């Protein structure tokens, strides 16, 4: 199963890309995608705790433009977006 994770905001800077392509053998939950992103950060940016915190605090959005929680199941090839928290006034 192929999952395309579209990246926005600071996530684009962390991964130096606008999307990541992840492969899995079976259906996964958003929580699994979040954990995989954190695992990648631990390898590439092991000393930067703020990057991991950003992923933990980010929301995920389905292809139907709905915010989905960590228990949302991805059953087949899908596109999902990660939306980091933003600041401003």
Predicted regions and their residues:
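Ubiquitin-like/PB1-type beta-grasp interaction modules and other compact soluble beta-rich domains
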Residues: 1-88
């Amino acid at each position: 199963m192929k999952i395309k994770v579209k990246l926005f905001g600071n996530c684009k800077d962390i991964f130096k890309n606008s999307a990541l392509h992840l492969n899995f053998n079976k259906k996964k939950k958003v929580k699994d995608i979040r954990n995989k992103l954190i695992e990648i950060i631990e390898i590439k940016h092991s000393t930067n705790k703020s990057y991991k915190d950003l992923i933990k605090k980010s929301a995920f959005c389905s292809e139907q433009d709905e915010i989905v929680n960590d228990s949302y199941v991805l059953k087949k090839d899908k596109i999902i977006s990660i939306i980091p928290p933003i600041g401003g006034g």
